[in-house]
Curated annotation (Swiss-Prot):
The keyword Protein biosynthesis does not apply. The keyword GTP-binding does not apply. It is found in: Mitochondrion. One of its GO terms (biological process) is mitochondrial translation. Component of the mitochondrial ribosome large subunit (39S) which comprises a 16S rRNA and about 50 distinct proteins. GO terms for cellular component: mitochondrial inner membrane; mitochondrial large ribosomal subunit. Disulfide bonds: none annotated. SUPFAM superfamilies: Ribosomal protein L16p/L10e. The lineage of its organism: Eukaryota, Metazoa, Chordata, Craniata, Vertebrata. It comes from Bos taurus (Bovine). This is Large ribosomal subunit protein uL16m.
């Protein structure tokens, strides 16, 4: 108050270099750096690149079969864990892989990887399921159409391609995500650590769920007669798999 009466000005505050907006001063000291991985236990196979996949199965005659959409429905029971590699492409939904998808993955990954330090392998079989199709302008009837091409059914939770060697996840994550975005179903790049984290997070959500109105409880108790619009798959998978789609947020 006396400064206002006397007309004195307030002292000018000078900002120091230690303010939040300024860069901290350089200080000498010991730095703690992460150890460099040695990859001593990694062995590169004789043929590290992805092998060529046949367009059609090498059998005398393939039997034509119905659609069998259960081939892409629900969770996968095969190729859900790592075998030799440390990084892979994880399918987040069901779908069919055509021969063109195999060629896209093979050419993209083989062009990127260094065969002296990296290797890749398939976790899905070659196309074996026959897809029939009739020509344009044909009338209805006349039996099932001729075989047009072959596909490989994939369920949610299956590994498509594994990559390993003397490399880290940051080096291959970009190319694996690039391949995953071109697949006919949702997919993403994962490592051993991230795959374990996804599984643990799902178990923790189920264990610490605070909402009593879960899909399993509503379907089991047949609340509001919901069982008349549900299928046996909904009771088995607790509503987490809807056809070829996977809904991980549902507990």
């Amino acid at each position: 108050m006396w400064r206002l009466l006397s007309g004195a000005r307030a002292p000018v505050l000078r900002a120091t270099l230690s303010d939040s907006w300024a860069a901290p001063p350089a200080r000498a000291g010991l730095k703690t750096l992460l150890p460099v991985p040695t990859f001593e236990d990694v062995s590169i196979p004789e043929k590290p690149k992805l092998r060529f996949v046949e367009r059609a199965p090498l059998v005398p005659k393939v039997r034509r079969e119905p659609k069998n959409l259960r081939d892409i429905r629900g969770p996968s029971t095969e190729a859900t864990e790592f075998t030799e590699g440390n990084f892979a492409i994880l399918a987040l939904g069901g779908g069919y892989l055509h021969w063109g998808h195999f060629e896209m993955m093979r050419l993209t990954i083989n062009r990127f990887m260094d065969p002296k330090n990296m290797f890749a392998l398939w976790r899905v079989p070659a196309p074996f399921k026959a897809i029939t199709r009739k020509g344009m302008g044909q009338r209805m009837g006349g039996g099932k159409g001729a075989i047009d091409h072959y596909v490989t059914p994939v369920k949610a939770g299956r590994l498509i391609v594994e990559v390993g060697g003397r490399c880290e996840f940051q080096e291959v994550q970009g190319i694996l995500n690039q391949v995953a975005h071109k697949l006919p179903f949702p997919a993403k790049a994962v490592s051993r650590e991230t795959l374990e984290k996804i599984q643990k997070d799902q178990e923790e959500r189920e264990r610490n769920n605070q909402n009593p109105w879960t899909f399993e409880r509503i379907a089991t108790a047949n609340m509001l007669g919901i069982r008349k619009v549900l299928s046996p798959y909904d009771l088995t998978h607790r509503g987490r798999y809807w056809g070829k789609f996977y809904m991980p947020e549902r507990v």
